[in-house]
């Protein structure tokens, strides 16, 4: 279907300024790479998401969903069809020890809201840069905590635009994975069950984790965080470091000198630079140690022609 027609129609469904054509997706990822989206939309509520899905299904237009782009590489050829950004779906409510957070809310902000209400259980998330939806998608975690420990249920939207509530068991959580990598559900909101705690103790733990993160991670450069999952009985960063790969650069992307588990965009790198460096690191580590590193970061989109 003609993308100009898609743009025109969706402009009548969403608020002014929330539908764009040929939007550069590098502006919507932490690593600052990615080509153009044919049509880029940023809905503000569930009804608008349903309208987009209904329209896309009617005309067989592919739809790709983005959170805040913290753990994704979008290829240099961009994304065909409709790209839906969920960054405006950000509501958070607190009732007793329960927090309900919408998909586009930053998980860091949710952890701070928990602190404000003297609730413990989300301290580990105080340095995770992703959205709530992304955190559920990959069962995000850090410093011994992970989303699956505190999630009780979630509201999702099916590929037909139907709303469903899923219990935690349906997520099939594992280490940095969930069922959402293999189905077409869109995570809309999550319910977290926390415990009452002491404000000063919660804050002290968050301050400690923030200090560790800032002292060990290359936050001064664009990155996607940890590139690889932790292999059994080992650490990806240590294997990469012991392979002598810190500082290895392809194009504008290099293995961080500060933390070997990170790859940083130091000089206008491209998605292809990033992908090539990932493959080089995987090949080198496997040759030296016999360990095949598994990607944690998602790669989506089309290659540049």
UniProtKB/Swiss-Prot annotation:
Family per record: Belongs to the MurB family.
UniProt-recorded Gene Ontology molecular function terms: FAD binding; flavin adenine dinucleotide binding; UDP-N-acetylmuramate dehydrogenase activity
Known pathway: Cell wall biogenesis; peptidoglycan biosynthesis
Alphabetic keyword roster: Cell cycle, Cell division, Cell shape, Cell wall biogenesis/degradation, Cytoplasm, FAD, Flavoprotein, NADP, Oxidoreductase, Peptidoglycan synthesis
GO CC annotations on file: cytosol
EC number: 1.3.1.98
Catalytic reaction equation(s): UDP-N-acetyl-alpha-D-muramate + NADP(+) = UDP-N-acetyl-3-O-(1-carboxyvinyl)-alpha-D-glucosamine + NADPH + H(+)
One GO BP: cell wall organization
UniProt name for this protein: UDP-N-acetylenolpyruvoylglucosamine reductase 2
């Amino acid at each position: 279907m003609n993308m100009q027609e898609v743009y025109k129609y969706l402009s009548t469904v969403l608020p002014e300024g929330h539908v764009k054509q040929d939007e550069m997706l590098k502006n919507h990822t932490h690593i600052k790479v990615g080509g153009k989206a044919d049509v880029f939309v940023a809905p503000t509520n569930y009804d608008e998401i349903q309208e987009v899905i209904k329209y896309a299904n009617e005309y067989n237009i592919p739809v790709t969903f983005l959170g805040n782009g913290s753990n994704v590489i979008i290829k240099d050829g961009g994304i065909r069809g409709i790209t839906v950004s969920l960054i405006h779906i950000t509501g958070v409510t607190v009732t007793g020890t329960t927090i309900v957070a919408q998909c586009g809310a930053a998980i860091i902000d949710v952890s701070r809201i928990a602190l404000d209400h003297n609730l413990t259980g989300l301290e580990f998330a105080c340095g995770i840069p992703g959205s709530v939806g992304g955190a559920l998608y990959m069962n995000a975690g850090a410093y011994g905590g992970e989303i699956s420990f505190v999630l009780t249920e979630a509201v999702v939207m099916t590929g037909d635009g139907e709303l469903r509530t899923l219990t935690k068991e349906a997520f099939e959580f594992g280490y940095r994975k969930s069922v959402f990598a293999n189905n077409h559900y869109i995570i809309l909101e999550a319910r977290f069950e926390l415990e009452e705690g002491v404000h000063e103790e919660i804050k002290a733990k968050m301050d400690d984790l923030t200090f560790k993160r800032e002292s060990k991670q290359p936050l001064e450069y664009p990155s996607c965080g940890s590139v690889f999952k932790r292999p059994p009985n080992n650490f990806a960063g240590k294997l990469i470091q012991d392979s002598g790969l810190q500082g290895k650069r392809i194009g504008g992307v290099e293995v961080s000198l500060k933390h070997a588990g990170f790859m940083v965009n130091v000089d206008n790198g491209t998605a292809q630079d990033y992908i090539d460096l990932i493959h080089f690191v995987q090949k080198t580590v496997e040759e030296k140690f016999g360990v095949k590193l598994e990607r944690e970061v998602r790669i989506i989109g089309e290659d540049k022609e």
